[in-house]
């Protein structure tokens, strides 16, 4: 019996795969647990429609990620920290970078950063993982605060 998998099933296939299984396995295991549906014209059309929409979403996200990469690489964020005896008092963290990026119109998320970032004085380049194979380098400059002590 040919069925379309509704979920990933170990040793059988992934979601939306068309597989051939024994009748008893399909009737007594896959169908009651809603892991698969019988292969019909309608289920095949639904599968094709879903896969087409999924591909469209993928293409849109890929295009948006390339636009975001261009914006990120053209932007430099500036921060200032208080200093004590020439050393930074505190550090710049991921959350502060994300907040300032949002004010400049960049939609950064915490998962884009490889590690938690803690920056002291100087020029820094942070590699961001935006989408599958798309990475961007964000430039951050941290300077001493020139305010009155």
UniProtKB/Swiss-Prot annotation:
Function in brief: Binds to the 23S rRNA.
Record's keyword annotation contains rRNA-binding: yes
GO CC terms of this entry: ribonucleoprotein complex; ribosome
A matching Pfam family: Ribosomal_L9_N
Gene Ontology biological process terms from the UniProt entry: translation
Name of the protein in question: Large ribosomal subunit protein bL9
Gene: rplI
Sorted UniProt keywords: Ribonucleoprotein, Ribosomal protein, RNA-binding, rRNA-binding
GO MF annotation terms: rRNA binding; structural constituent of ribosome
InterPro entries recorded: Ribosomal_bL9 (IPR000244), Ribosomal_bL9/RNase_H1_N (IPR009027), Ribosomal_bL9_bac/chp (IPR020594), Ribosomal_bL9_C (IPR020069), Ribosomal_bL9_C_sf (IPR036791), Ribosomal_bL9_N (IPR020070), Ribosomal_bL9_N_sf (IPR036935)
Family statement drawn from the similarity comment of this UniProt entry: Belongs to the bacterial ribosomal protein bL9 family.
Keyword RNA-binding: yes
PANTHER family in alphabetical order: 50S RIBOSOMAL PROTEIN L9
Gene3D superfamilies referenced in this protein's UniProt entry, alphabetically: Ribosomal protein L9, C-terminal domain, Ribosomal protein L9, N-terminal domain
């Amino acid at each position: 019996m040919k069925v379309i998998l509704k979920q990933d099933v170990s040793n059988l296939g992934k979601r939306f795969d068309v597989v051939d299984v024994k009748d008893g396995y399909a009737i007594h295991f896959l169908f009651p647990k809603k892991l698969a549906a019988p292969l019909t014209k309608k289920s095949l059309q639904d599968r094709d429609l879903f896969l087409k929409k999924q591909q469209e979403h993928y293409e849109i996200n890929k295009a948006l990620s390339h636009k975001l990469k261009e914006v990120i690489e053209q932007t430099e964020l500036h921060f200032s920290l208080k200093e004590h005896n020439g050393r930074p008092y505190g550090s710049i963290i991921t959350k502060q970078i994300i907040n300032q990026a949002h004010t400049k119109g960049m939609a950064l998320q915490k998962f884009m950063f490889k590690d938690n970032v803690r920056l002291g004085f100087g020029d820094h380049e942070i590699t961001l993982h935006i989408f599958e194979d798309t990475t961007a380098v964000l430039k951050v400059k941290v300077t001493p605060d020139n305010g009155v002590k």
